[in-house]
Each structure stands twice: as structure tokens, then as C-alpha cells.
């Protein structure tokens, strides 16, 4: 209203169906009124046909209530994709929970491990965040919370993977050696050298034998092949041991030494506006909520995805999107 009063010409651009911050003062009713008669941008650029149809089905009661009719066409594959310009179809899969083995779970795990696609796990709130983190830990999946660094940094994983090769004599870059130093303890580092900064070192590869000769590493370092046994424990023992178990699972399953983490998780309010290749939606809801607010949350959750989506039914009394 302030904008309309003080400005002769103004533009409203947005999607009232994604009004999910009512608790912060957003008014869905106002946005739907503003959208009446607005130009409809018909072509979608994110969701494939399956997710597009699902989202339309989810939001239909609201469209009917406000007498809204939108075209919203499904997206095509982007430039550079092997199917560039073709309609994205996609699939909708179902998981009973995060722990039961089934064909659709195996499809998800296979896609995570054997493609370069991105995955978003999203949910309404607690306890779903615990469910999803336990799932990642169980299957040795690299993951990060949306907007944060990885649960275990790439450099930490690299140290566990590359140390045995370094101990066997393989030369490593100065960068990698500095990363080792961030974790190594007194079992291999010479006393007083734990804070060594490698100033003025030439950026090239070095062997473990060179570091031993320079009195930085102990001679017995070459016999230590397991990084878990020579690194410094950080945090509570129980948490540290769980971290090591998780790291071993990641190494066993295989991971990309470089690049971004492709699997992320967050609640629905956090992921609004983001795009991922695939989306996994947990419909658990633990308290009564306004029906239309539920539908908008569910709509936002699924519409983050391009290709495939997975649905996990509520593990509680209430289901997101059900009165």
C-alpha cells in the first residue's frame, strides 16, 4: 500500500501460491487479490511434467477457492543437456519411510551414487530432520544442510582416503599436506611441529620421506596406514566415533574428491526459491495447521524439483496437505 501511494508506476511479480511466511506477516489473501487479472507467465522452466502435474493437483483447492486458472506448462531439458529442448517427464516414487528397503529406495540410492544430479530432502520440521540425517549416515551419503558446509568437509574425507597412499610413498601436493596437518596428531607429527605453517614452501608435490627427513614427521609414520588411528580426536568421544563410522561408510561407497555436495536437506521454509534436480518430500506434520497453508507448503516442497520426486508418508498423527 505504501508503494502504491508514493509511486506512479509499479510492478508486482511473484507467485501467491508460494506464500508460506504467514507467521512473519505475509498475507496470502492480499497476494491472491493482487494477482487477479495479472499476466500469466505460462512457460515453466523448472518442473518436469510429473512434478508439474502433481503441484497443480496439490494447489487445486486454492485455485478453485479463488477462481484461479493458470496454464503453467512443464519445463524442457536445458541447454547443454543431451535431451536439450525435449519435454522433461520425470517420475513420482514412494517410500514407506527412511529405513524400509524397497525398489523405490534402491532407485533413489542408485541415482545418488551413479549420477551427477542434485537432491533435496525437505520436510515440515521435527522430527523429520533427525530421520533424514540418520538416513544419510546409514547409507554413507555425503550431505549438507541448505546454506551450510558439508556434514563432513571434503578435505577431511580426502585425508582419510589419501593418507594410506601418502604413507606408501606417493607424492602429494603441498595443499594436501597442509590438509593432513589440520588433523594429524602426535602419533606421527614430531613434537613441537603440530602448528607448522609451511611458510615459503614451493608449491609442488612432496613425499612422506621428505617430511621425515625434515624432522616434521616421525620415521614410524610410514607404518601408519589408517588415518583414524593418527588423527586428533575432537569433540565428545561418542560423537567422534560416530563421525569416524560415517566417514568409513562414505569412503566405502565412494565419493567425488572435489566439487560441491549434491545432497542437501532443510525444512520447506528454508528451501523456497531453490532448484534441485530431484526432491524427496516427507509429509510428516506434528500439529494442526490451516489447510491452505499446508497446501502452499506442500506445493513449494515438490516444486523445487526438475526431474523425479519421492514421497514419504507422514510418520506422525498429521499429514501435510490433509485436513
Question: Residues of each region from the PLM?
Answer:
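The feature marks helicase ATPase cores and/or their adjacent C-terminal helical subdomains
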Residues: 1-323
